[in-house]
Amino acid sequence: MNTTAKKVFAALASLTLCASLAACGADTTPASNSGQKASGSKTVGIAMPTKSLERWNRDGEYLKKQFEDSGYKVELKYSDNKTDQQNNDIQSMIADGVDLLMIAAIDGSTLTQTLDDAKAKNIPVIAYDRLIMNTDAVSYYVSFDNYTVGKLQGEFVRDQLKLDTEAGPFNIEFTAGDPADNNAGFFFNGAYDALKQYIDEGKLVIPSGKTKFEQVATPEWKTDTAFDNMQNTLASYYSDGTKLDVALCSNDSTAMGVAKAITSDYAGGNQPILTGQDGDITNLRNIVDGIQTMTVYKNVNDEAAATLAVSKAVLEGGTPNEGLLSSLGAEASYDTRSYNHGVKVVPSYLLVPYVITKDNLQKLVDTGLYKWDANNKYLESTAETT
């Protein structure tokens, strides 16, 4: 367990004595017994989108372990990126009588009726990583600052090309994420806004003319779709040897497809700057090999710790608020203004992501979720051997 998680779980042990986060009354029952009784009789339902993307496997299994280590029972379901299946999976957990639902939605707009059923049975709902839309059943949202994810990518490109001092022009193409994923727009907007000044000045040029999210979106974040789209872009705008300086991809699965297209179809002699997000193992290998330049990493330890803290407070009858951040030990903010899901503004705990390049891979090892291979060249997932 990393330092962040240890701090959180230590703080949470004391919270089990509290009726809320704001006030604690006297309790003669020993803390350990109280915590075991409170959590041991309660079940958390975790709904993840799919096993086909590495990050959801990592998040799901890690969350399950952290909740179980804290004494909760857990139902964990993956829904194969099918909205109907996710609705059925959640309905099944409601029928099983779970005490709390923690949901990473496939499509945040498709769960309204199902979550109305959860609300009718007084089952609280926490949206994990992706905001769930158009329902008042969602109590809290735990994620990273998704606009900052894109902003970090854009600022990385700015610094790599020295756009504040170099005249350019440099050519850039964007690959965005799934239109059904509420986060995808934040990622794209953060990156585009960070670079808009240089696009307006003509230092950055987009030969394809694809400047809108809808033009560069990748349904289901599929690698094959990203490959096809970039292959078409290269054939249409770069086949004459026009130089591609930057391929800005919102995440690692799309970056994989774009990297494949560049390797097979790009006629230029340079290796374009290629961005990503998530810290997937194959992409980290590509970073070492110079195929991908960076990835934005969202530490699942921190996200799980924040989710556990919010969940525990809710399950114990408390009201999570800004004060909860003091126990996290991770850089985070409490946002009550930004995330309006169509019914209300959802109180949100937003953690801070960071940039990973070939020069700071050890930072991932320090999370405990990665390790160096036998040759100390590439990273492997510790989850593969646990």
Segments the model singles out, each with a brief description of its role:
Residues N2-A5, C24-T386:
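A residue-level marker of the well-folded mature domains of exported/periplasmic proteins
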Residues A19-A23:
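C-terminal motif of bacterial Sec signal peptides marking the signal peptidase cleavage site
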Residues A5-T16:
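Sec-dependent signal peptide hydrophobic core
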